[in-house]
Amino acid sequence: MAADSNCGHSDYSQAVSYLYGLQKFGIKLGLDRTRGLLNALGNPHKGMKFIHVAGTNGKGSVCAFLESILKEAGFKVGFYSSPHLVRFTERFRINGREIGRDAAASLTDEVRAVSDPDDPPTFFEATTVMALSFFAREHTDFAIMEVGMGGRLDSTNVINPIAAGITNVSMEHQQYLGSRLLDIAYEKAGVIKEGLEVIAGVTQPPVVDLYGRLSSEKGARLLRVGKDIRYRTTSSGLHYYGTDRRMEGLELSLKGSFQSRNAAISLGIIEVMGRKGFKLDEDHVRAGLKSTFWPGRLHVFSHEPALVLDGSHNPGAIRTVVSTLDKTFSYKRLILVMGIMADKDIGSMLKEIVPIADHVIYTRPVYERAADPKVLYEKARGLGAVGEVAADIPLALERAKALADSRDLILVCGSLFTVGEALTYLDPVAYCPDPVRVY
């Protein structure tokens, strides 16, 4: 997974330090600064072919499926994602390969040179512009853009995509997107644009009604998974029944029955691309689904005992993991290693998963937003599992391994930051971290 053989690089270190410094400006939703930066750079994104994916959970997996399928078909594919697990360069990929540190440093310098010191970009605005410039410079055939937050005012929404997807909607980021489910759904609907075909995995009737109305008003075509696009989960993947294609016996490399729905959304987008003149052979689709790699999502690191890492970081994602554990893994006892960000719905997350565990080790990654593990421990009182606190992730992992026998399952979860730090500890060569921590 390492982008370069060497983890250190002075120009790169300075670049990520600058980007990290932009986080002090917080989150400022809106497109004006992003458009201004792109205009100053000559609007490199104009004329590019984009795929835009929004949603509360699963959008990274949908994007990863798309990247793998298009790569198998021989296309040069860019993929912009967030957050990263261990390295900033993970956010910018072409055909699965991360951007090099020299290129990342150079792009940072270019964005910094055209930034207004009186109205500086946020971290995510700067990285979005870097991604668009990088993909344009590399002449990608397609660029897959994962929404950072919401959609309507997310900096990725400066693009004009050829296809879009919305995975699902649940409560998240209420301080920015609104306090009601429909407020959040409306923000995500910002990716629905005139003339666009949008594949949606949403299920709540009010959200379905909202998206139907907005699509009609904008002259877009909404295709729903479960209605216009159907699928059936199998032991190894899914059968897919789309608007133009039927494909049975599709195998998925990503674990969890929930991934069949994400795959169906991806295949719906592939069908949209076919109607745009980019029809892919079924062999490429099959091979792409079977070879998709997306670490940190029900990621099996080792066996006997099984050590699995999942970056689920909200109640909906935790609920999905809980519903799939027994279907995916065979184990005697479940030992959790949990680290959660302080701004998340901690109580609801714990209520979803702690009761099914046998032992829970509460910990925290080295990150200022992380909740104190003692707080997690106190909030979990009365939920059933035996609990204890470990000051950091290495201690938590060693404690979990000491407790487990070969038939147990150790699950690291609660945050992508927790998972990323765990991977760095478990395999510091493959998951070599940045010299400066940037999220």
Q: Model features per residue range: what roles?
A:
Residues 1-55, 62-73, 80, 116:
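Short functional linear segments
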Residues 25, 31, 35-46, 72-159, ...:
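ATP-dependent carboxylate-amine ligase catalytic core
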Residues 66, 131, 211, 376, ...:
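Aromatic/hydrophobic pocket-lining residues that form π-stacking "cages" and hydrophobic walls in ligand
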Residues 133-136, 268-275, 424:
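Short glycine/serine- and small hydrophobic-enriched flexible loop segments
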Residues 201-202, 214-233, 253-257, 285-291, ...:
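Beta-strand->loop->alpha-helix junctions that form or flank phosphate-binding loops
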